[in-house]
């Protein structure tokens, strides 16, 4: 095939240009992401049950829905949380690869079976089913720069004017508003109600009767009488729109004709629909909307669309209102992709310099360099065909592929020049002869490297998604590289290279290149003598090899494990939890102190702080608080001390001084869709029905043991501690004797102490809600219970304390379930210097000490880590097996592949040493780097074994053939290995966004390639001679036995 294109170079150029054109067009359509869709798809079901406790929500809503979710296809796990504000979320997580649209339809179908079984109030509130990931993509905030708007005004504007356009934006899955829109708030005065002998239920009924929209029909509507000339719509009573209209609602007409209106018993006015959340931006009143990404959506495109939507709305915003972005996870996407592209450019430059050093000819160096854009652009075309995106994983694959793809072209060019120098042939004739020599080696290398990476594409789960990105990228690049090496490179050699005089190996050149050539020639002679010595004394070196293999196995058992390396995402979280039963005012004091520290003491790194009270990732309530901390761009905070991890450590040390609150500062995980924090994530589960109290005791024991374990830090419950609750007990017999109905009692309690949604009203053209509730000063203490009255069947007003009492007890404001059983979520991090795998092992030891009946399950990132850890050995074994079979097919021998395969531990030991010395972990990126090392180690061995086998077949002895092959292939092996190592160096020394992943993959590959090159060039001939001799002796014995039998 190569001869055809050597004679038709333009044909070869046309093929290359078509490949480049296809790839270039593909780049324009490929989406850009930090990572592919690693997180499994999840469907969230959200329900509200106003006034209900967490326990009530769990018993009457959560369990009813969970029981109907059985039988859903591809279900991985199901989790739920119920809060004391009546809210509830069930998250149904599916196996990786499940179509999220199909998953949502299945969940909705199952939900239809559960809906009739839910309380009427829940059905009335509605049930939301969304395709959204767990974490927030970004927060859009609004502040009043001139102080003319309150937080209620800002919240109302977001809900009324921003929420709907954003929810319609492509890629938005769900949202949460930190605040609420206006509602018509009716604050009841119990004393005035009693004086007029009215109850909250009377008020609710009057509002429902008089705040209505009536469909009144038409005048002259069809069918009409003959001759009718008029047709007009009748406008009947409409919904009320102003506070004054509500104030005039008639409640009662006394016998003397006097009237009691709503304003006589209540304060009426616009107020917030919900008062549980208070947001601030850098200390100023604010509101915000947190946006979650739809499952499978592109984060970068969605964020751009959101910003464009906001930009379209800004001209219509009130004067003094300013939009801010206090939390955004997408800058790291652009920055990390930019860093990898920069690394790609640096790698290409370094590879070019290495090639020029060895080839010492600009034309010869240019030929492999031309292969780089052809292969890289062609690889983008393949990525588009497979539906992939441009992300850090595919770009890492490109960086690794640069060293691999120039290898093939270098081998071709170097061999053509060697043939010209040794035999004095013209470039065209040398190219023809050279391709006849190395064509088999090129195909063999491509097969082996493809065999290393191809099995990765068939693994499942989130780890399989990561493996697949590398696999398809590198295998595509390798395939295109061989095509270019067989088609374009020989054609270029034939047309671009200048003839070389016979016997000219460059040692007579002057200057630096001449010195380098003489030094390398001298090194080659020394190398030949070294190989001859090793082949003469094989036993000691085989023993050394056994020691290396033993050391490799020992290091594999000692190196810490992880799923993915932690990354500086440019954002930080701080979570506040004040003592159970704390008021919002008390929590706000702690949040203010936290914000002041961050803005004053960490101003060099912190850009803004958006705080929220009433909410955090652990739950909702007045004792909860949260801070979204946006850091300055990476280039404005250089140095390790300004990284998000060091900032979190300093902040945590300061927050430990807070005596009246628990405050945790933590960075988000490397894959945001898999959780909200770095470290480990698990659920303690009540597997035997031991009850809430035993489970709570088990959790507390776990936290105590974890605090004493040196392998763990920042271990905390991702929930809320039991808090004081006032249990109202109704004496049914007394109530019946007094003529009071239980329905009236329940209605009064719900309205007065809770918040009752009555119906809707129209505010500036938008439908909003009407809420009925007792005045704040009539529901602050248990004694206020006596202020409220219920009317009995005789029309008399009976105080609550006549039939009701109360007592204090403890209860949970948040209840969790995992896979259908009560559970409590726990988060934590490994101690400095340890990996998440070490921390998870420590956790598993602690769980063994918990009470019987309490189990555990990993979730989120930890679930994926356990899954990836179990897959890694199978991945290595399968890759090695496929490599062996490819080599056996290539050499038509079962023995020769062993001499190639035995070199693998020499590369692996270097990767393990480099990774351990740098304090890194055995994570997914390390595993990919290790497979790359395995492939390149085998490639170097193939270059020697291929030539040794040919020389042996030409009649030379095994030892002589091995030494001659080593001499001939030393220069290309060193050149290609050095080119690859230097091409990966930018990954290992990178800084800024995405540097954690780059270090993880670059460090192992460099270490592995150094040892694979330095050691393998001596051990490969030893393996070839030892294996060939062994199998030859065995074959001779078998032949002799056969002949003897005859």
Swiss-Prot record:
Disulfide bonds: none
Induction or repression: By growth under severe iron limitation.
Topology Periplasmic: residue spans: 29-339, 386-391, 461-473, 558-871, 918-923, 992-1004
Topology relative to the membrane: Multi-pass membrane protein
Localisation per UniProt entry: Cell inner membrane
Domain of life: Bacteria
Predominant location: membrane
A Pfam family reported for this protein in Swiss-Prot or TrEMBL: ACR_tran
Sequence similarity: Belongs to the resistance-nodulation-cell division (RND) (TC 2.A.6) family.
Subunit structure: Component of the MexAB-OprM multidrug efflux complex, composed of six MexA subunits forming a hexameric tube, binding to a MexB trimer, which interact with the trimeric OprM outer membrane channel protein. OprM is thought to not directly contact MexB; instead, MexA joins MexB and OprM by forming a funnel-like hexamer anchored to the inner membrane. MexA may initially form a hexameric ring complex with MexB prior to OprM, then OprM undergoes a conformational change as it contacts MexA, allowing the periplasmic gate to open.
Further details from the record: Pyridopyrimidine derivatives, such as ABI-PP, are not exported by the MexAB-OprM efflux pump, bind tightly to a MexB hydrophobic pocket and so potentiate the activities of antibiotics such as erythromycin.
Protein name: Multidrug resistance protein MexB
Source taxonomy: Bacteria, Pseudomonadati, Pseudomonadota, Gammaproteobacteria, Pseudomonadales
Gene this chain is encoded by: mexB
């Amino acid at each position: 095939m190569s001869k055809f294109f050597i004679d038709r170079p333009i044909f070869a150029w046309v093929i290359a240009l078509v490949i480049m054109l296809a790839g270039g067009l593909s780049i324009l359509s490929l989406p850009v992401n930090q990572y592919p869709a690693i997180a499994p798809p999840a469907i969230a079901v959200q329900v509200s049950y106003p006034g209900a406790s967490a326990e009530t929500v769990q018993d009457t809503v959560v369990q009813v829905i969970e029981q109907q979710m059985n039988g859903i296809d591809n279900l991985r796990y199901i989790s739920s949380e119920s809060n004391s504000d009546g809210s509830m979320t069930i998250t149904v997580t599916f196996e990786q690869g499940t179509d999220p649209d199909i998953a949502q339809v299945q969940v909705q179908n199952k939900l239809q079976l559960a809906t009739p079984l839910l309380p009427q109030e829940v059905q009335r509130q509605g049930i939301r089913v969304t395709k959204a990931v767990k974490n927030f993509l970004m927060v859009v905030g609004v502040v009043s720069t001139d102080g003319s708007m309150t937080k209620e005004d800002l919240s109302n504007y977001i809900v009324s004017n921003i929420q709907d356009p954003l929810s319609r934006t492509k890629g938005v899955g769900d949202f949460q508003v930190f605040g609420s829109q206006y509602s018509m708030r009716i604050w009841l005065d119990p004393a005035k109600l009693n004086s007029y002998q009215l109850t909250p239920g009377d008020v609710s009924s009057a509002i429902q009767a008089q705040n209505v929209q009536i469909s009144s029909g038409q005048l002259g509507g069809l069918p009409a009488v003959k001759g009718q000339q008029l047709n007009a719509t009748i406008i009947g009573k409409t919904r009320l729109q102003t506070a004054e209209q509500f104030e005039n609602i008639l409640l009662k007409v006394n016998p003397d004709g006097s009237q009691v209106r709503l304003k006589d018993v209540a304060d009426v006015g616009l107020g917030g629909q919900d008062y549980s959340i208070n947001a601030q931006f850098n200390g100023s009143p604010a509101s915000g909307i947190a946006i979650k990404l739809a499952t499978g959506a592109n984060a970068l495109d969605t964020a751009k669309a959101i910003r464009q939507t906001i930009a379209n709305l800004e001209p219509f915003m009130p004067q003094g209102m300013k939009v801010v972005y206090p939390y955004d996870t997408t800058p790291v996407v652009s920055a990390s992709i930019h860093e990898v592209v920069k690394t790609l450019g640096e790698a290409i430059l370094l590879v070019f310099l290495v090639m020029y050093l060895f080839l010492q000819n600009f034309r010869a160096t240019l030929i492999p360099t031309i292969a780089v854009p052809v292969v890289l652009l062609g690889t983008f075309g393949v990525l588009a065909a497979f539906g992939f995106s441009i992300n850090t994983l595919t770009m890492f694959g490109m960086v690794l592929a640069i060293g691999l793809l120039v290898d093939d072209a270098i081998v071709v060019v170097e061999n053509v020049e060697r043939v010209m120098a040794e035999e004095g042939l013209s470039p065209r004739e040398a190219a023809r002869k050279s391709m006849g020599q190395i064509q088999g080696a090129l195909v063999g290398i491509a097969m082996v490297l493809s065999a290393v990476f191809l099995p990765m594409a068939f693994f499942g789960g989130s780890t399989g998604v990561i493996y697949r990105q590398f696999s398809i990228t590198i295998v595509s690049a390798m395939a295109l590289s061989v095509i270019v090496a067989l088609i374009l490179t020989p054609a270029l050699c034939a047309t671009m290279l200048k003839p070389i005089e016979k016997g000219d190996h460059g040692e007579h050149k002057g200057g630096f290149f001449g010195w380098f050539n003489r030094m390398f020639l001298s090194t080659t002679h020394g190398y030949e003598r070294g190989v001859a010595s090793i082949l003469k004394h094989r036993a000691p070196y085989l023993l050394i090899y056994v020691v290396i293999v033993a050391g490799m196995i020992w290091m594999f058992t000692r190196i810490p494990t992880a799923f993915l390396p932690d990354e500086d995402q440019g954002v930080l979280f701080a979570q506040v939890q004040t003592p159970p039963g704390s008021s919002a005012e008390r929590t706000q004091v702690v949040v203010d102190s936290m914000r002041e520290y961050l803005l004053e003491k960490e101003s060099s790194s912190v850009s803004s702080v958006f705080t929220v009270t009433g909410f955090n990732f652990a739950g909702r309530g007045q004792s909860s608080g949260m801070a979204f901390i946006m850091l300055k761009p990476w280039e404005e905070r250089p140095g390790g001390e300004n990284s998000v991890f060091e900032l979190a450590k300093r902040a945590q040390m300061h927050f430990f001084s807070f005596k009246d609150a628990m405050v945790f500062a933590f960075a988000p995980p490397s894959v945001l869709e898999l959780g909200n924090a770095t470290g480990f994530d698990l659920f303690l589960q009540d597997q035997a029905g031991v009850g809430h109290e035993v489970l709570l005791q088990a959790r507390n024991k776990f936290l105590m043991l974890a605090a004493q374990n040196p392998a763990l830090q920042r271990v905390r419950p991702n929930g809320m501690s039991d808090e004081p609750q006032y249990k109202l007990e109704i004496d049914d017999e007394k109530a019946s004797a007094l003529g009071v109905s239980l329905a009236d009692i329940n209605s009064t309690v719900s309205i007065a102490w809770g918040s009752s949604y009555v119906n809707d009203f129209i505010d500036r053209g938008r439908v909003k809600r009407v809420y009925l509730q007792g005045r704040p000063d009539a529901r602050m203490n248990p004694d206020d219970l006596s202020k409220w009255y219920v009317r009995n069947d005789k029309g008399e007003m009976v105080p609550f304390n006549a039939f009701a009492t109360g007592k204090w007890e403890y209860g949970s404001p948040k209840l969790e379930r995992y896979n259908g059983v009560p559970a409590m979520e726990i988060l934590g991090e490994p101690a400095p210097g340890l990996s998440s795998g070490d921390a998870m092992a420590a956790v598993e030891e602690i769980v063994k000490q918990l009470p019987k009946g309490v189990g555990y399950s990993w979730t989120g990132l930890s679930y994926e880590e356990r899954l990836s850890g179990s897959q890694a050995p199978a991945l290595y074994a399968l890759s090695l097996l496929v490599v062996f079979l490819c080599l056996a097919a290539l050499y038509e021998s079962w023995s020769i592949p062993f001499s190639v395969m035995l070199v693998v531990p020499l590369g692996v030991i270097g990767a393990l040493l480099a990774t351990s010395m740098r304090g890194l972990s055995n994570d997914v990126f390390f595993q990919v780097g290790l497979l790359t090392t395995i492939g390149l180690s085998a490639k170097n061995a193939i270059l020697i074994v291929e030539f040794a086998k040919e020389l042996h077949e030409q009649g030379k002895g095994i030892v002589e053939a091995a030494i001659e092959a080593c001499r001939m292939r030393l220069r290309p092996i060193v050149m290609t290995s050095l080119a690859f190592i230097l091409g990966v160096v930018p990954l290992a020394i990178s800084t800024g966004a995405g540097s954690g992943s780059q270090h993880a993959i670059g460090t192992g590959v460099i270490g592995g390639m150094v040892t694979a090159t330095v050691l393998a060039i001596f051990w490969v001939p030893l393996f070839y001679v030892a294996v060939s001799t062994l199998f030859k002796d065995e074959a001779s014995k078998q032949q002799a036995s056969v002949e003897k039998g005859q």
